[in-house]
From Swiss-Prot:
The protein, known as: 2,3,4,5-tetrahydropyridine-2,6-dicarboxylate N-acetyltransferase
Catalytic activity: (S)-2,3,4,5-tetrahydrodipicolinate + acetyl-CoA + H2O = L-2-acetamido-6-oxoheptanedioate + CoA
Family the UniProt entry places it in: Belongs to the transferase hexapeptide repeat family. DapH subfamily.
EC numbers for this chain: 2.3.1.89
UniProt GO molecular function: tetrahydrodipicolinate N-acetyltransferase activity
Taxonomic source organism: Bacillus licheniformis (strain ATCC 14580 / DSM 13 / JCM 2505 / CCUG 7422 / NBRC 12200 / NCIMB 9375 / NCTC 10341 / NRRL NRS-1264 / Gibson 46)
Function description: Catalyzes the transfer of an acetyl group from acetyl-CoA to tetrahydrodipicolinate.
One GO biological process term: lysine biosynthetic process via diaminopimelate
CDD domains: LbH_THP_succinylT
Entry-linked NCBIfam families: DapD_Ac (TIGR03532)
Alphabetical list of Pfam families matching this protein: DapH_N, Hexapep, Hexapep_2
Length: 236
């Protein structure tokens, strides 16, 4: 897994072409109307749908208002710097409603549940489950065969670029609604209890709980049984 450098991300955002894409349902005398260089019109007769950049389509609508009877615009972003990740060829289970930005790395057989928000530069290892409504901030890195519980937050670090991101090592289980702050490393095989706020590094194969999170014990057989990772949930 390759972690993106913060300066790479900053440069990517700075130099990206900002986009305000729209989807326009349009009705009228549409023959011959040029909706702009970026536009992709799908028009049959006097009705159709046009996809493209708002600045171009807005100009076309204004220039041809005498020919256009009506239109409805769908728009979900303004001057967006980062597109969402193309999911079609990723070998993972990604459920509807997850928001995953471009420049995110997702390992094979990972699971991304509904409502998860995953920011640019994040890394998700093979077989890791990101549960419902989890937030992975910029450059947050999660190893293999982890479970990040519902509603948890792994804080992101893009600025300042010198700051260290959150690193979750392999085989870690994080309970629901936990928060791991910037710069923290959670060691291999550790367990973070639900609702914990983790402000310092967690040793491998330990259990931490509380606010702020403190070590309560080493991993034992009982804990292993209660935090078992089920590979059946990760099969494609």
């Amino acid at each position: 897994m390759k972690m993106m450098d913060a300066n790479e991300i900053i440069s990517f955002i700075q130099n990206s072409k900002k986009s305000t894409p729209v989807k326009v349902y349009v009705k009228g005398d549409l023959e011959g109307i040029d909706f702009g260089a970026s536009a992709k019109p799908f028009i049959t007769g006097n009705t159709g749908v046009v996809f493209g950049e708002w600045a171009e389509i807005q100009a076309a609508l204004e220039a041809n208002k005498g020919k256009i009877e009506d239109y409805v615009i769908e728009n979900d972003r303004r001057n967006s710097a980062i597109p969402t990740l193309d999911l079609k060829n990723i070998k993972a289970r990604i459920e509807p409603g997850a928001i995953i930005r471009d420049q995110v790395e997702i390992g094979d057989n990972a699971v991304i549940m509904m409502g998860a928000s995953i920011n640019i530069g994040s890394v998700i290892g093979e077989g890791t489950m990101i549960d419902m409504n989890v937030v992975l901030g910029g450059r947050a890195t999660v190893g293999k065969n982890c479970h990040i519980g519902a509603g948890s937050v792994l804080a992101g670090v893009i600025e300042p670029p010198s700051a260290k991101p959150v690193v979750i090592e392999d085989d870690v289980v994080i309970g629901a609604n936990a928060v791991v702050l910037e710069g923290v490393t959670v060691g291999k095989g550790a367990v973070v209890a639900a609702g914990a706020i983790v402000v310092e590094d967690v040793e491998p194969y330990t259990v931490v709980a509380g606010t702020p999170a403190k070590k309560i014990k080493d991993i034992d057989e009982k804990t292993k049984g209660k935090t078992e990772i089920k590979q059946e949930l990760r099969q494609l």
